[in-house]
């Protein structure tokens, strides 16, 4: 009987150890990001792959916060009848998540933002309906108390964030008529407005303990939004990015990037923490996660390319977001946070002692648990996790962060517990993976690296090559001078080209391909009679001839003499005198009483000019009796009668 019981004890120890050492499927032992959707909480790793989901029994999740000391997530459900704020923790035996009510519902609350103080174990949240900020301890059924009341002044609290090290609470006032970013001590004293200008509708806010800065989202007028930053006292304000077609709610900050949730695109976006004043560009989305696939329309891109990345596509509307920052590992040496971190760790250690069981079986399990954390890691029985010392990571602290991190250099841990590489001479890059000689020397040149780090690498060129990178072929350059040397023997030739010219002369230059150097084309004979020059010349000559012809014609017209006026006088008489045998009608003038004179100007024969000869008086008499053709006949006939 004793043997059977002892065997069962050993079997039970083995089974429990196996359960503790083997993570169950769907349990986020190593999650880095947690995002609240409308009906669930989604856990993702550092590459934004979904590893688990939880809180499926809720209908309208919104804000959330994370207690890194005890691995607890606190979240809000807007439609739950009994509770307002809940906690989510892992069940070690069932290998799943258990949600418990933390803050009971007292009315029609509408939680906008959540924050947690791990030292005093208090929750802080903003109520957008009552326009107040409340706080309450997570243990016990204490009625929530009001920390800040903005209802009298018309304010609307939205995002909240706790500065654990300096014991202050920051919040955003999203009232469009008077928006602000404010802070107050956790005991309710010394309320201060730190931002009240150039701001439209601030939403989520977060305190970055690593850089001692504030980051918040500003929902600008129209379709624009921005992410801004400042020091904890409101100074050194910077615009990290400005974009459009997003509806961001909450944000989280890591060592080098900012992440925020967007309800419009149902996605999580990221951007470097370095300020970029220019308008950014929305990048194309990555492939959707197999766990949550949905159809979406990518936002309209803007003008410029910028490091704005869509890191995760979600199946539902994205709301709250938290990130694992390594608070207790990164800030152990920070002069503002060292004492707070020490106190929190002491409290956690004290709580862990309550979970120790004094039985022999439990002591054996305790040995297995302690052996789970390697490299000096501290085991947390309540959460079944290892808190690793600086320089190690992994679920059991089994991975050295500097292992194979630097390719050509020495790895050391920085003050913020991140690996940093010190490169060997001739190598550069974040991990010393880039050679300074890579692609530098051409045409077989050899790269030389000086021992002086400030001196640039140089190239040792082979024969017949030169230049800073051995890019100049002296044979090809000298061949140009050799070609000109045949025509001008006295021409100057650079040093070293004479021997090459002799070699080319012996080979008749048949085995050398002479290149075309535009900067040396001045040495060649220029081509004068090109097609464009000929066309321009012909057009110029023709135009000149036409211009001369026009000028000559104009001069001739200007100086041409006028045609003389023809004036003729005809003498008409009734009857010729017969007193002289030699008198004729043309030689004998008629008597004054028997003759008349007709003066015709500018007239001539009808066959020669256009002006006919006629008697104006006779025309007046016969104008009404005959036509124009008959008048001409009469005039000519009368003229013949008078002349002959």
Curated annotation (Swiss-Prot):
The family database entries (Pfam families) matched by this protein are listed as:
Ldl_recept_b
Q: What task does this protein carry out?
A: Has a role in spermatogenesis and oogenesis.
Q: Which UniProt keywords apply?
A: Cell membrane, Differentiation, Disulfide bond, EGF-like domain, Glycoprotein, Membrane, Oogenesis, Repeat, Signal, Spermatogenesis, Transmembrane, Transmembrane helix
Transmembrane segments in this chain: where?
A: 532-552
Q: Where in the cell is it found?
A: Cell membrane
Please report the record's description of how this protein sits within the membrane: Single-pass type I membrane protein
User: Where are the LDL-receptor class B-type repeats located?
Assistant: 121-166, 167-211, 212-257
Species in which this protein is naturally found: Drosophila simulans (Fruit fly)
Family to which this protein belongs: Belongs to the cueball family.
All copies of the EGF-like domain together span 398-430, 433-471
Q: Which GO terms describe its molecular function?
A: calcium ion binding; Wnt receptor activity; Wnt-protein binding
PROSITE patterns given in the database record: EGF_1 (PS00022), EGF_2 (PS01186), EGF_3 (PS50026), LDLRB (PS51120)
S-S bonds: 402-411, 406-421, 437-447, 441-459, 461-470
Chief localisation class:
membrane
> What is the protein name given in its UniProt record?
Protein cueball
For the Cytoplasmic compartment, the record's topological domain ranges are 553-644
Task: Supply the Gene3D superfamilies for this chain.
Answer: Laminin, TolB, C-terminal domain
Query: Sugar-bearing residues?
Result: 82, 108, 175, 190, 313, 473, 508
Gene Ontology cellular component annotations, sorted alphabetically: plasma membrane
Tell me which parts of the chain lie in the Extracellular compartment: 27-531
Q: Where is the signal peptide?
A: 1-26
Set out the biological process GO terms recorded for this chain's protein. canonical Wnt signaling pathway; oogenesis; positive regulation of circadian sleep/wake cycle, sleep; spermatogenesis; triglyceride homeostasis
Looking up InterPro entries in the UniProt record yields: 6-blade_b-propeller_TolB-like (IPR011042), Cueball_EGF_LRP_Nidogen (IPR050778), EGF-like_Ca-bd_dom (IPR001881), EGF-like_dom (IPR000742), LDLR_classB_rpt (IPR000033)
